[in-house]
Amino acid sequence: MVVAPYLAVAIGGSLGAMSRYLVTIMAQNAWGIKFPYGTLLVNTLGSFLAGFFLIVLVGRFSAEESFRLFLFTGFLGAFTTFSSFAAESLFMFEQGYWFKLMTNILVNNVGSLSMVFIGTLVAKYVLLGHQGSN
C-alpha cells in the first residue's frame, strides 16, 4: 500500500479543518451568529481557491498527484463544508426562518459557483498577464 496519497489527504484535511474553524470564528466575531456567515465565507472562498488552483496547478504547472490530493481533496475538501450548510439550512427551515433559509441556499450555491468561475478567470489573468492593456 502506498502511504503518500493518504498522508497528503490527511495533512491537507487537518490544515483545511483548522483553517475552516479559524475563519468561522473570525466571521462570527465580526458579524455575529444570526446568519451562518462563517460557512458562507469558507464555501465561497474555497470555491474561488479551487477555481484558481485548478487553472494554475493542474492546467498550467501539472502539479504532482500527491499535491493535488493534498490541496483539493484534503485542504479544500475540509475547508469547505456542504454538511454544515445543509444542517444550518435545516435548522432555519425547522425554525421557520424562511428569508434566511432562502438567502442561505441561494447565496451559498450561486456564490460558490460564481466564485469558482471567478477564480478561474483570475488565474488566467495572472498567468497570461494583462497583455491587452499595453
From Swiss-Prot:
Pfam families: CRCB (PF02537). One of its GO terms (molecular function) is fluoride channel activity. The chain crosses the membrane at residues 7-27, 38-58, 69-89, 110-130. It comes from the Bacteria. Keywords: Cell inner membrane, Cell membrane, Ion channel, Ion transport, Membrane, Metal-binding, Sodium, Transmembrane, Transmembrane helix, Transport. GO terms for cellular component: plasma membrane. The keyword Transport applies. GO terms for biological process: cellular detoxification of fluoride. It is found in: Cell inner membrane. It is a multi-pass membrane protein. InterPro entries: FluC. Na(+) is not transported, but it plays an essential structural role and its presence is essential for fluoride channel function. It catalyses: fluoride(in) = fluoride(out). Na(+) binds at residues 77, 80. The keyword ATP-binding does not apply. NCBIfam families: crcB. PANTHER family: FLUORIDE EXPORT PROTEIN 1-RELATED. Fluoride-specific ion channel. Important for reducing fluoride concentration in the cell, thus reducing its toxicity. Belongs to the fluoride channel Fluc/FEX (TC 1.A.43) family. This is Fluoride-specific ion channel FluC. It comes from Legionella pneumophila subsp. pneumophila (strain Philadelphia 1 / ATCC 33152 / DSM 7513).
